[in-house]
Swiss-Prot record:
Lineage top rank: taxon: Eukaryota
Gene field: dus2
Reactions mediated catalytically: 5,6-dihydrouridine(20) in tRNA + NADP(+) = uridine(20) in tRNA + NADPH + H(+); 5,6-dihydrouridine(20) in tRNA + NAD(+) = uridine(20) in tRNA + NADH + H(+); a 5,6-dihydrouridine in mRNA + NAD(+) = a uridine in mRNA + NADH + H(+); a 5,6-dihydrouridine in mRNA + NADP(+) = a uridine in mRNA + NADPH + H(+)
Protein family (similarity comment): Belongs to the Dus family. Dus2 subfamily.
Stated name of the protein: tRNA-dihydrouridine(20) synthase [NAD(P)+]
Source organism of this protein record: Schizosaccharomyces pombe (strain 972 / ATCC 24843) (Fission yeast)
Length: 479
């Protein structure tokens, strides 16, 4: 799968019962960058006869079934595999590793649950119980990093809660970082706190500082209400990403940049998705009941709540549905994209990009890599700080020379270059790439761009690029 990039990610949080396959696929369709599955305890996978991996050709999924009943404990769709984090409940390094091996080839990451406050979890030494036995917590993460993360080349992370004091929390975060995990999610509430109590972000910036010093990604959970709210939290506190739980439970279209859809529309689309992936009826009905809370069509809600079968649910929502090839219900998710940039004063131009809103636009369009063209030998040192700043936006910056130009353009979705760069222009045209050209004014030797037959100075170049990228965003929304 490859290691995950958590930067600038707005994600579906792990939720028991809610986070099954149809909800995850719907979250990704609406705009979630990563999705966590519901916690599954190691012993559920291992006790008796271990789960078996079965290819379900009828719905194009991978099922993990428990013999002899063949009950499906976990179902993965290929569309989500490289964005799916499997959350594991465990109190044992040995069992955690054994369980993780069963699913490691079909997910992008394994996340250890160290925050669930439920009695069954804490009583068994799992979830928030691990916060009181930090040596065990660290030993499980050590084992997962070394025996799963490294050999399977997937990301290992954990999700914790705040401890009673800031000092204790910071010490724990530092210990976790030292295990070699790729990311930590902090639920900004202590174990005794109810989810209705406001999240405590009073020292979140200090937690971020510890993670930055250890080169570990930091995500935050608690009171994040929408995709745009998540981006604001990322910018305000300097975290890499956020997880959304309760807001997504009520209306998973909270991941839409354009704003949420009506509860009825979401319920209707959820039902279609559940039918498409053959979701357990009881789980589908449970999730629909969460979506239908509050303002909802009374007659539909009554019929849905008394439904005994999928046929009853289809009648309640007045939909005619037949199993398809999933092309309409499970559309292909956006793949991560790259772009190539060539400019006269590259460091200055990249600094200008950082100061603009363009990186956020690129992130929304799933751009994760920028290849910057340069033949200057000493430019690497100049770009060290810039490189780190780009990573904070979820975009990796790489320098390339003319030798690597053709392959970079071949894989790129967008090329930004000066018109004088004929080799780049020709390559981009041949590969039919979307191109933003920056002609050079021979009198001033400054970069300018053409817009409606008028030349503009380089200080306006970013404005024009931004407008072009807005066009791409609008086209993406239409598609």
């Amino acid at each position: 799968m490859g290691l995950l990039n958590y930067s600038n990610k707005v994600c579906l949080a792990p939720m028991v019962r809610i986070g099954e396959l149809p909800m995850r696929l719907l979250a990704l369709r609406y705009g979630a960058n990563l999705v966590w599955g519901p916690e599954i305890v190691d012993k559920a996978l291992l006790s008796g006869t271990p789960v078996e991996r079965v290819v379900n050709d009828r719905i194009n999924c991978i099922d993990f079934v428990k013999p002899p009943s063949n009950k499906v404990l976990f179902r993965v769709h290929p569309l989500e595999a490289n964005r799916l984090i499997f959350q594991l409940g465990s109190a044992s390094p040995e069992l955690a590793v054994e369980a993780a091996k069963l699913v490691a080839n079909d997910v992008a990451g394994i996340d250890l649950n160290c925050g669930c406050p439920k009695h069954f979890s804490v009583h068994a030494g799992m979830g928030a119980g691990l916060l009181k036995n930090q040596d065990r917590l660290v030993s499980i993460l050590d084992a997962l990093v070394n025996e799963i993360g490294k050999p399977y080349k997937i990301s290992i992370s954990c999700k914790i809660r705040l401890l009673e004091t800031k000092e204790d929390t910071l010490k724990l975060v530092e210990r976790i970082c030292d295990t070699g995990v790729r990311a930590i999610t902090v639920h900004c509430r202590t174990t005794p706190m109810r989810n209705t109590e406001p999240a405590d972000r009073s020292y979140l910036s200090e937690i971020v500082g510890v993670c930055r010093n250890k080169d570990v990604s930091i995500l935050v959970n608690g009171d994040v209400l929408s995709y745009n709210d998540g981006l604001d939290v990322i910018e305000k506190y300097g975290v890499d990403g956020v997880l959304i739980a309760r807001a997504a439970e009520r209306n998973v279209s909270c991941f839409r940049i354009e704003g949420p859809l009506s509860s009825f529309k979401v319920a209707e689309e959820f039902l279609k998705m559940a039918l498409e992936v053959d979701n357990n009826f009881g789980n589908t009905k449970y999730c629909l009941n969460q979506i239908m809370q509050g303002s909802f069509r009374k007659n539909v809600r009554q019929l849905a709540q008394t439904a005994k079968t999928y046929e009853d649910l289809k009648k309640a929502f007045e939909i005619e549905y037949k199993h398809s090839d999933a092309s309409s219900v499970c559309p292909t998710l956006e793949k991560e994209k790259s772009l190539v940039i060539s400019f006269v004063d590259l460091p200055s131009f990249l600094e200008s990009l950082l100061a603009s809103n363009i990186l956020k636009q690129l992130s929304r369009l799933h751009f994760t890599k920028i290849f910057a063209v340069s033949e200057e030998e000493d430019i690497c040192k100049q770009l060290d700080d810039i490189h780190e700043k780009f990573l904070c936006h979820g975009i990796a910056l790489s320098l390339i020379s003319a030798d690597n130009l053709a392959s970079a353009i071949a894989s790129a979705h967008l090329v930004i270059c000066m018109e004088k760069d004929e080799s780049i222009m020709n390559e981009a045209v041949c590969d039919q790439k979307i191109t933003i050209r920056l002609p050079i004014n021979s009198n001033t030797n400054e970069a300018v761009v053409e817009c409606e037959n008028k030349s503009m100075q380089s200080k306006h170049a970013l404005d024009i690029i931004q407008e072009r990228i807005k066009d791409l965003e609008e086209k993406a929304q239409v598609v």
